Amino acid sequence: MFQNDVKQPLSWEEFHGPNLGYVLELYDQYVQDPTSVDEDLRGIFDELGAPPSEMKEEIGKKENSVVTSEQIQKIASVVKLAEDIRTYGHLNASVNPLRKEKELQELFPLKEYGLTEEDVKNIPISIISPDAPKHISNGIEAINHLRNTYKRTISFEFDHVHDFEERNWLSKSIESGELFKKKPADKLVSVFKRLTEVEQFEQFLHKTFVGQKRFSIEGLDALVPVLDEIISESVTQGTSNINIGMAHRGRLNVLAHVLGKPYEIIFSEFQHAPNKELVPSEGSIGISYGWTGDVKYHLGADRQIKDEDTKSARVTLANNPSHLEFIDPIIEGSTRAAQELRTQKGYPAQDVEKALAILIHGDAAFPGEGIVAETLNLSQLVGYQVGGTIHIIANNMIGFTTESNESRSTKYASDLAKGFEIPIVHVNADDPEACLAAVQLAVEYRKRFKKDFLIDLIGYRRYGHNEMDEPSTTQPMLYDAVRKHKTVKNIFADKLVSEGLLTKEQREEIEQAVATRIEEAYQKVPSKKEHTIQEIELPEPVSNGFPAVDTSVEFDVLRKLNEELISWPDDFQVFGKLKRILEKRAKVFTDDRKVEWSLGEALAFASILKDGTPIRMTGQDSERGTFAQRNLVLHDSQTGNEFIALHELSDANASFTVHNSPLSEGSVIGFEYGYNVYSPETLVIWEAQFGDFANAAQVYFDQFISAGRAKWGQKSGLVMLLPHGYEGQGPEHSSGRTERFLQSAAENNWTVANLTSAAQYFHILRRQAKMLLREEIRPLVIMTPKSLLRNPNSLSEVQELTDGQFQPVLEQPGLVHDHEKVSRLVLSSGKVSIDISDRFTQMEEPKDWLHIARVEQLYPFPAKDIKAILSKLTNLEEIVWTQEEPQNMGAWGYIEPYLREIAPEKVKVRYIGRRRRSSTAEGDPTVHKKEQERIVSDSLTRKN
């Protein structure tokens, strides 16, 4: 509506009489010092420009044009009154359905501004409300119009929005009256039908499944027609993907009525009855289940919809655990993925009109959970913005038993959004027409400005936090009011009947039809007694694990890719020291030099792009690399211009994205997970600055990445790079907490690797890329190196890239001995393996009693590879597991039972490493060095 409604420019002709003299005086002040006048007047004068010279002459000729100081004060007071109504009117709006608000007149009486009605009546309308409807004929009508506009069951906050164009558009949209035009009768009756479905569905569940948790929507029933309207308006404008994130409050109702999940399936989930045969055969709705499953109010769904013009769109409600707001960045990531075309080299082509993100927040969770602020911070960042998200706070004014004054330090649940200059609308959930107006403003603002918008939908909670909870024990007065309060369906029906838009007979027919449909659906649900509950087995592709895949790349292909990776425009000035480092890479394929870690990564990326697989990589400092190792984005030392060689590859067949992320682990890894789930063909990589900081995103590891497929059937091939290794840098820069990933390792849910060579890194990345669209795909966690990035013992021959493949276990290079003499097998993983290798090569005493191997893939446990080594060592006495982490950390707790299971009879399994500790590492580098030397020495010293 509003995008085509162009505002008429202001003209000096609108000012006359005493007011003209006053305005000219203010304009003179403005010319001398723009800051001496009100911000809104500055905007007006910016638009008006200088007044016509004849106007100044005319005003000087007229005796009655002399403006007294009293008149000036009157006009200034009216301007102040108008601005106060806009800025503070929300404080007295009727947005709380359970409380009658004070009249706005009491908040802004004319006498407090030194004004009378006659004073205000003579002020030009354009000074008070330049966008007022045409029927407004004088100043007092304009003020009353503002009062009525800003004191309704909908109120507005946008004083914190600093952009003049946005503020101007918002005020025009609100004050023009277009927003509040009466909707067609059939539209309003349709909303009533929807509210009837919402209410009767909840009431049926309440009486049929007594005491079962469902987290009812009642009190915020309007959420469903609000979502209907957002989706309808967006699809009409050409949006083809709508992604919704929400917690469990009201989820079942949204699933049933917005996503079209059949009542029968939801009822069967309450009865724990079989429901596979209840899924619609036409496939209009996608419902995924894992093998362990999840409670019904965590599940999501997909739906294909069409509008009247046959425009099609995919609507998705994402799966979400009870970690309420942690779905937020996942929705943002999936929306960004839906907006991007990744089939051409360079950055993906983004079209923000293709997809819309809708986030439904809780009033306690929005200010209470930090992930919300982290997600809002992504909204204007080039690597993460989605052209605006529509936020809805499902505000029932309570969090479990905690009231708002106990759960936030702000007046409104929405106040956090002000820091990000997001316009806010507060709306009474008992007024569906006001709710539709809020949606209209939100959709048009997002379309016009490509920014976020927030609707604070204020209602109440009819029952307790869940249906087994009695809320009157903690909120007796509140729930006395709730019990007496009519439902929104009945309030709205009474209104429509009184306006002659709905007859009582039509109302009863609609209610009866809905009740019949619900009852018929219930009768289709099989009885729980008719089936035997059985545990669901893992899908065969998951249980079988990864098949062997060829990840080698021909020599000539790699050589050409390498040449292009170290090429840049002739007039591009690469920083001198970096230029010398990069130029050395040219000799790898000519002078028989070895491949170091970052070159192995770059070659892997280049070859993956050649294969047609898009890549997206983000993380703190990921463009350069925390340790200055990567340098995928070059900066001209003279101009600062950027150059990305991976964007210029002649044979690239897919896009490459790399972005430095904000200083946030949670929102960023959530975003990347969402991107990967929506775009499974893309190799999505998140890199921690140090692995130690990854636990700031622990919720995503625990609830989504490790368990999402088992719970929801939600596949992911996300790659996580966690710099890890003990180098004397203390407890914040040593450990990626390998033990936590291994603790969650089961059912082939992810790969956990701790690598020691560039070739291994090259091959595991290529393997992951090749598996992306296969059923066997799983996330990949790599403990990446720091000091090993440039360690000679982590370098690889080019032949290892052209001929080899990823090896779950590597035997120590240079082992030459009689296997029958070996009494100890030393197993380790990651950096300590290189420490052991360095010491081993320096040993002068006999080594024939030792055999050494590196476990590169910790999970899934490479039993076959280790058994193959054990089969050669016929006189083995002990298996030693060496690690640099404390005994209660690292891989020992995970790997010990595996080693004992495969160890030959009478072969001991022993631990060498740091003792059990509460902190990951020593803070003193001297103590670290001494301890590290002991660990390596003990591993290579024969027991007497």
From Swiss-Prot:
Q: Does the keyword Oxidoreductase apply?
A: yes
Q: Which GO terms describe its cellular component?
A: cytosol; oxoglutarate dehydrogenase complex
* Top-rank taxon: Bacteria
Q: Per the UniProt record, which EC number(s) apply here?
A: 1.2.4.2
Keyword entries, A-Z: Glycolysis, Oxidoreductase, Thiamine pyrophosphate
Quote the biased-composition stretches of kind Basic and acidic residues, using this chain's numbering.
925-936
GO MF terms, alphabetically ordered: oxoglutarate dehydrogenase (succinyl-transferring) activity; thiamine pyrophosphate binding
InterPro entries documented for this protein: 2-oxogl_dehyd_N, 2oxoglutarate_DH_E1, 2oxoglutarate_DH_E1_bac, DH_E1, KGD_C_sf, ODO-1/KGD_C, THDP-binding, Transketolase-like_Pyr-bd
Q: Which residue windows are coiled coil?
A: none
CDD domains membership = TPP_E1_OGDC_like
GO annotation, biological process: glycolytic process; tricarboxylic acid cycle
Record region (Disordered): 918-944
Give the cofactors, semicolon-separated: thiamine diphosphate
| Catalysed reactions listed for this entry | N(6)-[(R)-lipoyl]-L-lysyl-[protein] + 2-oxoglutarate + H(+) = N(6)-[(R)-S(8)-succinyldihydrolipoyl]-L-lysyl-[protein] + CO2
Q: What does this protein do?
A: E1 component of the 2-oxoglutarate dehydrogenase (OGDH) complex which catalyzes the decarboxylation of 2-oxoglutarate, the first step in the conversion of 2-oxoglutarate to succinyl-CoA and CO(2).
> Oligomeric state and partners?
Homodimer. Part of the 2-oxoglutarate dehydrogenase (OGDH) complex composed of E1 (2-oxoglutarate dehydrogenase), E2 (dihydrolipoamide succinyltransferase) and E3 (dihydrolipoamide dehydrogenase); the complex contains multiple copies of the three enzymatic components (E1, E2 and E3).
Q: Which NCBIfam families match?
A: 2oxo_dh_E1 (TIGR00239), PRK09404.1 (NF006914), PRK12270.1 (NF008907)
Q: Show the HAMAP family listed in the entry.
A: SucA_OdhA
Q: Which family does it belong to?
A: Belongs to the alpha-ketoglutarate dehydrogenase family.
Q: What is this protein called?
A: 2-oxoglutarate dehydrogenase E1 component
This chain's source organism reads: Bacillus pumilus (strain SAFR-032)
The gene behind this protein is odhA
